[in-house]
Structure formats: structure tokens, C-alpha cells
């Protein structure tokens, strides 16, 4: 029976900062480490013969969580709830690079 990880993510303290170029950034190193650790375990499971066929990160974008409302941010894309502006977090770039390198 194939296995799919359908919701894996972490609410971390995301602090919106302005970098030297004036761009808004979120340096979410805790989330990156969390995702890296879980992806490493997924790879290990596959190498050991587990039929893991898919992995879905929770969540693409910050959203309303039933248990926490808007107080916790799980997304790899920061959402300014007042303006709806979206800013990719460092974890989004991390996952982009992981996906781009898949199979290497």
C-alpha cells in the first residue's frame, strides 16, 4: 500500500525583516531545519523499502488555523493579512532547491 505524507509542517516564530536591498524577508531557519529533518527521514524510509510515494508540506501560505486562528504561521510563504501581500520565506527557497535537485 503506497504511503503519502499529506500534512507536515511547523509553526515557527516568523519575523518579517528588511534586507540590505530593501526587500522584505522571513528567515525561518527553524522551519527549514524541521523540513530538512523530515525529508531526510522520508528518504531513509524510501531507501529501506517503505512505499512512500508523496510528501506535502503544510502549508504553502500562512492561513487561518482552526486551533490557533491567525496567531500561528505554518506557511512557506508569508501573508500580510491586511494587504494580502505575499513574501516567500527562506523555507520556500529551501524547498525550491530541494525539488530542483531531486534525482541528482
Segments (PLM) and residue ranges:
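Non-catalytic scaffold segments within catalytic domains of secreted glycoside hydrolases
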Residues: 1-104
Amino acid at each position: 500500500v503506497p504511503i503519502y505524507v499529506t500534512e507536515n509542517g511547523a509553526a515557527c516564530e516568523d519575523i518579517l525583516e528588511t534586507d540590505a536591498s530593501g526587500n522584505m524577508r522571513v528567515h525561518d531557519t527553524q522551519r527549514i531545519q524541521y523540513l530538512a529533518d523530515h525529508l531526510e527521514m522520508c528518504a531513509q524510509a524510501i531507501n529501506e523499502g517503505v512505499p512512500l510515494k508523496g510528501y506535502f508540506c503544510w502549508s504553502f501560505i500562512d492561513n487561518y488555523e482552526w486551533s490557533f486562528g491567525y496567531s500561528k504561521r505554518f506557511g512557506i510563504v508569508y501573508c500580510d493579512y491586511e494587504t494580502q501581500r505575499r513574501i516567500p520565506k527562506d523555507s520556500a527557497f529551501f524547498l525550491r532547491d530541494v525539488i530542483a535537485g531531486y534525482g541528482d
